[in-house]
Each structure stands twice: as C-alpha cells, then as structure tokens.
Amino acid sequence: MGWLRGIALLSLGVLLAGRVNCQHVKNNVPRLKLSYKEMLESNNIVNFNGLANSSSYHTFLLDEERSRLYVGAKDHIFSFNLVNIKEYQKIVWPVSHSRRDECKWAGKDILRECANFIKVLKTYNQTHLYACGTGAFHPMCTYIEVGSHPEDNIFRMEDSHFENGRGKSPYDPKLLTASLLVDGELYSGTAADFMGRDFAIFRTLGHHHPIRTEQHDSRWLNDPRFISAHLIPESDNPEDDKIYFFFRENAIDGEHTGKATHARIGQICKNDFGGHRSLVNKWTTFLKARLICSVPGPNGIDTHFDELQDVFLMNSKDPKNPIVYGVFTTSSNIFKGSAVCMYSMTDVRRVFLGPYAHRDGPNYQWVPYQGRVPYPRPGTCPSKTFGGFDSTKDLPDEVITFARSHPAMYNPVFPINSRPIMIKTDVDYQFTQIVVDRVDAEDGQYDVMFIGTDIGTVLKVVSIPKETWHELEEVLLEEMTVFREPTVISAMKISTKQQQLYIGSATGVSQLPLHRCDVYGKACAECCLARDPYCAWDGSSCSRYFPTAKRRTRRQDIRNGDPLTHCSDLQHHDNPSGQTLEEKIIYGVENSSTFLECSPKSQRAIVYWQFQKQNDDHKVEIKVDDRMIRTEQGLLLRSLQRRDSGIYFCHAVEHGFIQTLLKVTLEVIDTDHLEELLHKEEDADASKTKDATNSMTPSQKIWYRDFMQLINHPNLNTMDEFCEQVWKRDRKQRRQRPANAQVNTNKWKHLQENKKGRNRRTHEFERAPRSV
C-alpha cells in the first residue's frame, strides 16, 4: 500500500502548490547561471575571505614573473600565490595613534576613513614595489622589497624610508585614483588636498621637478574621477610616447544643458617638462576628448552611457594600436543600464589631430576653432619625428598660450561600429569592472570578456561576428556568483599564464579559472552549443581546446554553434547529442494534479512538450491552457483525466538544435479504482495488522476516508472547508480524552518536537499520515 499512499501524497502536494505562470526564455540571459554554492561544490572557486581588522581589497598588482598577486587593502598589503590565493604573505601598515586621533577630531569616520587605505601599488624596479596609502588623511608612501628572483621569497617594507604622498594618493579613501610608474616616475590622477577639491594629473618621483595640470581651471579638469592610466607608444621613437588617462568628469559649462557627466580620455607627453615663461611646472601637451558610448535612437536621439567605470587595453601585434574596452553605466536614476564599448587608437589619434573646442558667438557656446593653429601643433611631443624642438621649454609662447586656453577637442571619440558591443538594461545590477582575454579557436580568434558587477557576480561574454567581422553578436556564456554575500566588485586581474581570474571587493579576494568546460555537459552537442572558445569536444568529453591537438575527433563551432553538423558523425543519426535519454513512470489520480519536472541546463534553451498516446506512434505538441500550464521547471497538469494517460516528451530547442531531455509515461488512476485498490489491500492486510489497527487512534482509522474526500474535492476553497471540519473533530476528540492520556500525549508531543531536525523521509512509511 506504500506506493499508493506515495502517489496520493504527491498528487495532493502538487494540488496545493498553486498556479505557476509560464515565463518565456529570454535571449540575453546567461546560458549557465552558477550560484556561490554551486561554484564551491564544483571546486571552481578559491576564496580569501579577508581579515577581521582589514577590508577594501581594491588595489591590485599582478606579477606573472614572480607568480604573485599584490593587493593593497586597509592597513595591509598582501602577496598572494597566483596558483592558490589561500597561500599568502602580508605586511601590516597602520597609521599611528596620533594620526588616527587627528583624523577623528577632523570629523572623519574612525573605521571607514581614519586608517591607511592603500591606493597606489606599482612595480618600482626589479627588487622593489612602490606603495602609497591615505594615511588617515595624511597620504604617505614607502618601498616594498620583493627580492630579485621569485625563489627569494622576500616580502617586507622599508621601515626607514617613508615619503610624503601628496599628489600620489588621495586623502579621502572614497576617491578614485589612477596611477602609472614608468622609468622611475609616477604619473597620478588624484586629489591633492584635504577637502578633495584640487584634482590634478601629477608626475612625481624621478630626478625632474614635479609637474601637474593647471590649477582651478574647469576647462582642464572639472571635478574628475580617475579610472586608469596607460603608456601607449605613438611611433617607433620613444620620445613620442604618450601617457593616456581615462576619467569621467562634470560637463563643462555650455557643453551640455543642465548638469551632466562625460567620459574622457586625456593625453600628455612622457617628455613634457612644462613651459619656460608660461605653464611653468605645468603640462604643455595636455589634451582631452570625450568618449561616446551610446545607442542610436529614433529621430537622432541617442541613449548615452556616460559614467565610465573601468577600462581594459587589449594588446595587439602592433603595440601602438591596442583595442580599448570601456565599461559604462547610465547617469540617470530612472533608467538603469550598463554597456561595453570598444575603441581603436586610430580613432583616438584622429580626434586629437582634429579641431580644438573654442567658445565663441553671442551665446558663448562651444564651436570648432577656425583660426590659425600655431606651429608646432599643441599636444605634439617635442622630438625629431614631428619637429625640431628638443624640449617643451623651447616651445614658442604662442603655442603655450594656445595650449593653456584650448585643452579640449571639439570632436568626440566614437566606438568601433558606432555602438556598444554589449548592453544590459533589464537586470538588477550594473557593470563595474572588465578584463578581456583573446582566445584562439578552431574558426578564428575571439575576445572573451569577464565583466564584474555591483552585486558580486562575474559575467563571461564572447563577441561573435555575424555576417561580417564588423557586426558582432554578444553571447553571454556564464553568470557566476563569486562572493558569499552581494558586494561591489572593485578590482579584476587576469593571468593568461595561470589561466586564472582574480576578483577584489570590500570583503575579500576570489580566484576562479577562465574555463570550466565540464560544466557544459557530457555530450558533444552540449559542448558545441556552449560556443565557448576555451572548450571543444575531444571525442570523449568537453575539455580545454588546444590548437595543437588532433583534429580528427575535435569538434568546435563558436561562430554558429551547430551540433548537427559537427556531432552527427560521432553518434547515431537519431541522437546526435550523444546524451542518454532519461525515462520516468509517474502515476496520477483522476481529478487531482501532477507535475512533470523538466529543466534544461541551459537557460537559453526553449522547452516544448509533446504527447503520445499509448500504442500510438503519432506525437502532438501540447498547447497551454487552463489545465496544462508550462513553467520554467516543467509541466503542470491540473484536474487529471483518463485521456491524459500516455507518454510525454520534453524537448529543448537552442540555436536551432532540438534535444530530447525527458520521456515520461503517465498513468492516470480513476478515483473509483483507487478506492477499490485501497479497500482490497486493507482487507488483505487486516489479519496481519489487527493488533496495530486496534492501537490506532480514531483519526488514523479514518485517514483513507479523509484522503478520498480530498481527491474528490480538488477545489481549494472546498478543501479549506473540509480541513476546518477535520481540525474541529480532532480538537473535540482531544478534549474527551482522560487526563492521564492527555499527559502521555503531551510527552509524546514533546519528543516529536525534539526530533524535528531529523530527516522526515526516514520515517515516512513508519507512521500513519496526519489528518490534513
């Protein structure tokens, strides 16, 4: 009788589950979505959960040669092993008690501001790093010894050598900073005062006098937030090298109606030493241009993503022309969205060689400068390549004067293909970080993007060309939760040597591999449908793709993801997926409900169901109605009827490929037949269970009558009324029990409460079911 009781309870549980609305699968959802628990269980993540007295693991420095990841945090600098970040060394660098007290007396937060937050961490030479921190609103810098060779295993601070950090690190830990250390000189975009109002791009260290941008001139910098700094060669002559700063700032007056934020790219020459009579110890080659990342709209009205969040440079064969990837978000509080735009340095240089922005006319508006531009052109580095000047101090006065009053370019820099390569507007998160890896696949090279979000997830996205390489399709491969609690991802580094990704947040550091081919499945079709450039079918499993591997059994199709073409010769023609079909037999009771569970691994797959009657080869597609409800987890059948008996097939359609996931045989038992079976089994077991029956309570003896009434009343309102009658009857019976019986019942109830944590399945068939 146990199997019948199990059927009945299953039917009753589904009936009480209520209605579930079917949601259509969206095309822009991740193919695989892995929770933090799933990442841990599959051993695909390593976590450093931080120290009790530290936080803010935001400043990363990757050293592939030493196989170390250096991380600057609150009062600490860490040296993590790239293979396993659980192996690390640390340096404690707090502020003195007097500094902390001064910070507190200035009205700052003792925990969130009055500490030493590491903001600069750069390679100084072969043996030392250079580090700067906020120092409780007194910036300071020092040197970290790391040894000459990886095997030296040295990691210590030079306690006797501290420097003033003004112009290198911000005072306020909440402010962003961008820095670059080249040839012993530190280039920093930061705030240089206690109040956080004097923003500038500095060059410090080295043998030359410190140099900076013009002070208190909004045409140069207007309340900027610096993102990153990069050295990009201009030509084969090192004298032409330029430093590029990426930042966002408030739009200049007259540049935009109302208050707005603009993303910028700024340039300075590496050999700029300031002017002779004007712009002394100030940049003479500083220029800036706006970065556009927008979606073209109707009537010429574009949707702009102006809040630049992060930048990644993808190096190419030509070091002068890396591809610039930028992550942007919207400024609007109403419309929340993120985008990734891609820029070429050719377009950037074209803008810097274009017209300068100039204010003119009755409305004093910004227009392209139409007058004579002095020679050599402002913004050009002094070298033998573009002129005969040896130093910026030799430049004519008219060049310096023009550069001082015209730091901005009129034309903006548009992205490649004039639109973003990825947009997200229908989600509850925004992009914060990006790193990119260029991967060799069977049919070409692909850029795989790893995008961090403000809720602690990482998106793995590949850009795939459509008809041409200029039209790109973004395929969201995975969404991975990499921290236990939602948190903003504030730093990311990629190690192509270790094939690992490192992620930083306020709470800790996480490490995960760039590829997890086994998560896609154990069949050729599943591996092919994944369209992951890292992975290919090797004849027996979905594994890491290597260009040097044998091609005879290797299957990979990133551009089209067509398993029919690439997997049909490896398997039987009727089953090119190579996947074993799961088969089930389910029993249901007439007039009740049952649920056929079928959920594909891929979230991009669209599920549809087919029905086949017994002894009939004809299959018909199931149409959704009031009785047949399709959900993301399967098919809900309400008010079962005899004609519902048959075979149900669950199919998944993805990228034009149909895959059968499940075959379910449903047997519907009518209520009269079920009652007859129950009574027959009761009579057959009567002699064997006489003693047990005598010991049963009245509520247990009438269980079948209760159950049959429930089956015959599938309406939830009627069931509520019936349950109320059962509860009233039980209360009446308890009141009529003798006092000693009541005491024993209370003891038994107490024991039951003590055992609530035990697995209910263990005793499911050892007790009679409760009254509803």
Curated annotation (Swiss-Prot):
Domain spans labelled Ig-like C2-type = 576-665
Q: Could you tell me the gene encoding this protein?
A: SEMA3A
Domain of life of the organism encoding this protein: Eukaryota
**Record-given protein name:** Semaphorin-3A
Q: What is known of its domains?
A: Strong binding to neuropilin is mediated by the carboxy third of the protein.
Where does this protein come from, organism-wise?
A: Gallus gallus (Chicken)
Cite the Pfam families for this sequence. ig, Sema
Task: Give me the stretches of Basic and acidic residues compositional bias.
Answer: 750-772
Query: Per its database record, what is this protein's job?
Result: Induces the collapse and paralysis of neuronal growth cones. Could serve as a ligand that guides specific growth cones by a motility-inhibiting mechanism. Binds to neuropilin.
What disulfide bonds does the UniProt entry report for this chain? 103-114, 132-141, 269-381, 293-341, 517-535, 650-723
Which region is the signal sequence?
1-22
Query: According to its UniProt record, which protein family does this protein belong to?
Result: Belongs to the semaphorin family.
